[in-house]
């Protein structure tokens, strides 16, 4: 058609006619390119990776108009640029929070305060009855849980005037995890106590906002396949894993060359073992950047927390252990990054505020406004990076060793650390004994390949007994 149009064109209208024809032809070519691009993107959705579990990792996008991934026609030249965005949701989202009185739990409730689209369906805590009562009166959950029945009985008497069901123990956690009124379970609970409720919630079809490291560290081989089977989302809440999640931006695992996991280095960065001989509890609880709970603050100082995060990264994003590189970044501005096979590095930056990854997980795939301090690049004096000192802080190296061995060894690493940190917080052992006890527990353990939940919990109990025995013998 276009060739015939050119032949019959006569000067002086020829230039105009040729121009019109060229525009028409260009439009046809652009349309063909758009169809091919849309087809390619749709084919990309079929890539089998962790996109089904980590929704931003191979997620489905939607356009401004029809099913076409390109935006509608406009007189503005920017309409030629492909525009993709996620659908926004304005409906009420109901959440249940395990560990509502802890650091992550209370910050999650701050996010709820600022977002009327979020509603609390249930809360659970350990023993902070007074704080739980305050939360119930403010957020009006249907169910509230306490770990001990004694604490639950106290809470029932305090909130007898309110229409809330108070439950206790593991049965209570399981009831909250599976309640039909909630859509998302926030696992902000500390320790391996979170494994069973997380599994139950996944089996009930709940999306998981994951802040409980122990769940994936000890049972990642159970959790991730189950999540894939049930088609639920695992949404990371830890700042580093959220940063990786955001930096992936839908890229499949095959395009990842390396994951750069940042660490602040803790309060003792740069110190020698000799300088750590007399560290007291108060010293270790002074984190330079983040406001966190007591145990995780100690873990950050020993770099064991980073070791646990390495294990999480492996399970969350389906990468090999050798693809995970820990980088000490004292300013905690770059929360983590992804290096791709073409050499490009994409990172997520921001102020050290846990509410940002919490809110991102709860509203994913939307981004919502959030009050708070913004990152001001003019005020940044410097951004520096260092290699972690794995000789002084060898708890991080032990994490790599435990994950390479696999099976029940990550459970040993986690349980030994939990018990050792507890002894340190009780002022029963020295600071440097924490990683030493972890190493001893790993050396004496006979690995169980592919352990089930019961074997994981039995391993935890046996490690606790071992650490207690070692401690008693050395008194």
Task: Cite the ranges covered by each PLM segment.
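Hydrophobic alpha-helical transmembrane segments
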Residues: 1-90
């Amino acid at each position: 058609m276009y060739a015939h149009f050119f032949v019959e064109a006569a000067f002086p209208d020829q230039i105009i006619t040729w121009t019109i024809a060229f525009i028409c032809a260009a439009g046809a070519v652009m349309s063909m390119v758009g169809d091919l691009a849309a087809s390619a993107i749709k084919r990309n959705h079929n890539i089998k990776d962790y996109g089904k579990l980590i929704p931003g990792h191979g997620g489905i996008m939607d356009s401004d108009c029809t099913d076409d991934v390109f935006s509608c026609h406009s007189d503005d030249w920017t309409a030629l640029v492909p525009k993709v965005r996620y659908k926004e949701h304005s409906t009420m989202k109901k959440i249940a929070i395990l560990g509502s009185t802890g650091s992550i739990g209370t910050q999650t409730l701050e996010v709820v305060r600022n977002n009327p689209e979020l509603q609390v369906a249930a809360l659970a805590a350990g023993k902070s009855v007074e704080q739980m009562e305050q939360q119930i009166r403010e957020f009006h959950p249907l169910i509230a849980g306490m770990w001990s029945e004694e604490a639950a009985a106290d809470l029932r008497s305090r909130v007898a005037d309110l229409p809330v069901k108070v439950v206790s123990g593991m049965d209570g956690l399981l009831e909250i995890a599976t309640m039909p009124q909630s859509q998302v379970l926030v696992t902000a609970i500390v320790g391996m106590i979170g494994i069973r409720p997380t599994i139950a919630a996944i089996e009930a079809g709940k999306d998981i906002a994951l802040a409980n490291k122990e769940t994936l560290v000890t049972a990642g081989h159970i959790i991730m396949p189950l999540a894939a089977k049930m088609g639920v989302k695992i949404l990371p809440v830890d700042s580093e894993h959220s940063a990786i999640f955001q930096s992936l931006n839908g890229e499949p695992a095959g395009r990842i060359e390396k994951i750069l996991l940042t660490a602040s280095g803790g309060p003792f960065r740069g110190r020698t073992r000799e300088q750590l001989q007399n560290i007291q509890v108060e010293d270790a609880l002074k984190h330079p950047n983040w406001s966190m709970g007591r145990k995780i603050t100690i873990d950050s100082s020993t770099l064991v927390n980073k070791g646990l995060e390495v294990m999480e990264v492996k399970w969350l994003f389906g990468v090999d252990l050798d693809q995970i590189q820990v980088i000490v970044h004292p300013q905690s501005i770059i929360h983590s990054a992804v290096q791709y096979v073409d050499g490009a590095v994409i990172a997520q930056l921001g102020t050290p505020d846990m509410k940002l990854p919490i809110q991102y997980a709860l509203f994913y795939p939307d981004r919502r406004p959030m009050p708070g301090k913004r990152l001001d690049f003019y005020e940044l004096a410097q951004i520096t990076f260092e290699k972690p000192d794995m000789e002084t802080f060898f708890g991080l190296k032990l994490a790599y060793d435990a994950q390479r061995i696999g099976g029940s060894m990550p459970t040993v690493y986690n349980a030994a650390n939990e018990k050792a940190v507890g002894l340190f917080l009780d002022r029963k052992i020295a600071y440097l004994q924490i990683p030493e006890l972890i190493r001893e527990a790993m050396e004496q353990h006979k690995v169980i390949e592919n352990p089930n939940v019961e074997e994981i919990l039995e391993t935890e109990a046996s490690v606790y007994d071992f650490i207690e025995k070692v401690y008693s013998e050395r008194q």
